[in-house]
């Protein structure tokens, strides 16, 4: 009788003991989006970021901009369709996306921080930041 009770107990307990390593199939991705080719690339890149967050709202996303890639982060910047980038950037920031701007680009292009949208982060080198995020922090690399 004791064996039957033990067997039933183990049978009932078995489903609870099954441990799935992926209890959340959509975990927090860590992704760096690399933008360096102007407004067209930026428009596509922001759309990709929106899609990424729709698929995985927990994603940790950093957008690193340098060279012509900083242009969309300037005050008054608009896409080829005439849409202001400022609102899209602000919406993504509210979802936790971080935007980092290359200070070398600013220096070489004679640009000032005052010309850019608020709440941006500035890094010494955009390229070095992309490498650092990949190598040291385990971010996946995406370039639209």
PLM region spans:
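N-terminal secretory signal peptides
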Residues: 20-64, 68-72
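Structured segments of extracytoplasmic/periplasmic soluble domains
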Residues: 48-56, 91-95, 105-109, 123, ...
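Stable alpha-helical elements in mature extracytoplasmic
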Residues: 41-48, 81, 85-88, 98, ...
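Sec-dependent N-terminal signal peptides
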Residues: 4-13
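N-terminal signal peptide c-region/cleavage motif recognized by signal peptidases
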Residues: 14-18
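C-terminal partner/receptor-binding element of secreted or periplasmic proteins
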Residues: 118-144
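Active-site-proximal beta-strand/loop segments in catalytic clefts of secreted hydrolases
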Residues: 35-38, 64-68, 103-105, 125, ...
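Mid-chain, structured segments of secreted extracytoplasmic proteins
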Residues: 62-111
């Amino acid at each position: 009788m004791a064996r039957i009770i033990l067997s039933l107990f183990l049978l009932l307990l078995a489903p609870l003991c099954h441990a799935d390593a992926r209890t959340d199939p959509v975990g927090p991705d860590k992704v760096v989006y690399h933008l360096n080719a102007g407004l067209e690339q930026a428009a596509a890149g922001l759309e990709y970021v929106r899609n990424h967050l729709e698929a995985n709202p927990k994603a940790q996303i950093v957008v690193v901009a340098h060279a012509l890639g900083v242009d969309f982060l300037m005050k008054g910047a608009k896409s080829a369709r005439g849409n202001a980038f400022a609102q899209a950037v602000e919406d993504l920031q509210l979802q936790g996306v971080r935007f980092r701007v290359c200070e070398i680009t600013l220096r070489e292009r004679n640009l000032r921080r005052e010309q850019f949208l608020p709440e941006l982060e500035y890094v010494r080198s955009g390229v070095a930041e992309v490498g650092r995020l990949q190598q040291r922090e385990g971010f996946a690399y995406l370039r639209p």
